[in-house]
Amino acid sequence: MMKFTLIRPPVLMPTFNMADLVVPPIGPAYVAAAVRQAGHEVCFIDAISLAIEQYTPRDTGTLMHGLAIPAIVDRIPEDTGVVGVSSNFSFEWPVCRELLQAIRARFPKTLLVAGGEHVTAVPEFSLAQSPLDVIVLGEGEETMADLLRVYEQGGIGQLSTVPGLVYRDASGQIQHTAVRPRIADLNAIPRPAWDLLPLEEYLSRGYGFGVNRGRSIPVLASRGCPYQCTFCSNPTMWTVRWKPRDPGDLLDEIADLQREYQATNFDFYDLTMIVNKQWIIDFCHGIEQRKMKFTWQLPSGTRSEAIDDEVSRLLYQTGCRNISYSPESGSEETLNLIKKRVSIPQLLKSMRLAVRNGLNVKSNFIFGFPEDRWKNLWETYRVIVRAAWAGIHDIAIWVFVPYPGSELFDQLRSEGRIQEMDDAYFGRLAAYADVTQTYSYCRALGRKQLLGARVAGTFLFYGVAWLLRPWRPFRILINSISGHLESRSELAVRGFFKRLLKGWA
């Protein structure tokens, strides 16, 4: 048995971030559960929950949310055999690298491992830029358990037998092991080890990925996404195979979380939960048959094809209150270029039905793809107006940033548009959520034009939406003050005033 320390690093966010998304770390919690089931002792250091009200300004104009790096290192047991660090979002890599350097300084002989979407996308870069020894590619549960078993028995020299790794061998050379297949049976994966971290810090504040609707815990109903959008890095992490869990097994987990943690709301972190219409119908019928009572949300974005009148009615009847669509663009030309398979007429019809059946609906758009022109943005503006007319409650307009592991990132690298993956580049990645900063990777539109287009699109949507439904801004203000949140705009307003009162903004 080995002692394994798993760390979720502090989170970086722009000072003028659109909203505070303080979420329990479901990915590391899954890995911790698998390692514990394999017989190892796990020390879980979640830097967010251990200092959930701590925000540290950085020279880059960002805030670091969570425990300071020296305090994290102080919590690592002296007799730990392996330290694992989660590295998901590329814009947080500078903090992750700083943490890894501090760990290596304190533990010069301890094996350092990282997993997550960022290091999976650029494993050689991550090894070259940090003191990491091993990178776990893709899904980490089985790979991490195998790594610890083999390392305990034979040291780093035996890691070549573990599929799904990139590592430095004893001579310092980078080695790739065999590709590990996706986990076949999602129902057999042990549930997240929430007992290893102070989950109550999130629950008591209603923190989660979605709107604050009480004591929220994240769950996953599926893994992977069958689509290949060129701006997305998920195919590198998950491949393009969508695999759902058994609805009954998922409902068993939800029932257990209600009983153990008095959870009242569940945020589904799936990349694309609603792909198969029959699956979501079976899930909703299962809630009804068991007479379960809870709210749930789909904050990541979902497909419109399967959400018709029947499905949207079932969603609301079984407690779903918030869903998000992610068409990204209203331009057919842009949609084809980014390989976004979405029908705008079907999307708008689905939006109308969702609103009619009581759901709170948000839509996500992205401006500034490399080939975008004003013509494409005007086409998107028309869809934004039609979405407001359909009655949806919120939109978010992001500016495109090229994430490592995505097709567009590789294209821009080959064209010389991304010359160095330095800290300035990673800082530009964080600007996607900053309401004051924009960086352009678009050939035809500059930074100021995209910033203006983003602001104009936001005002256009809310101007039309509130003109048609003039009571909504008053509800947003009242709910933001009271803390009884129903929409993402209320979450954003409340988060902004929270930062303002603390003197961040």
Language-model segments: which ranges?
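N-terminal [4Fe-4S]-dependent radical SAM core
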Residues: 2-5, 10-19, 61, 162, ...
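Glycine-rich beta-alpha loop elements in corrinoid/cobalamin-binding modules
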Residues: 3, 34-185, 405
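Radical SAM enzyme core and accessory elements
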Residues: 4-6, 37, 41, 78-79, ...
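Residue-level recognition of beta-strand->loop/alpha-helix junctions
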Residues: 8, 46-51, 236, 365-367, ...
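Flexible glycine/acidic-rich beta-alpha junction loops that bind and position SAM and/or redox cofactors
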Residues: 13, 51-53, 123, 227, ...
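Short catalytic helix/loop segments, enriched in acidic residues and glycine
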Residues: 22-35
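Structural recognition of alpha->loop->beta junctions
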Residues: 125-143, 314-322, 379-397
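Radical SAM [4Fe-4S] cluster-binding motif and immediate context
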Residues: 187, 192-362, 369, 374, ...
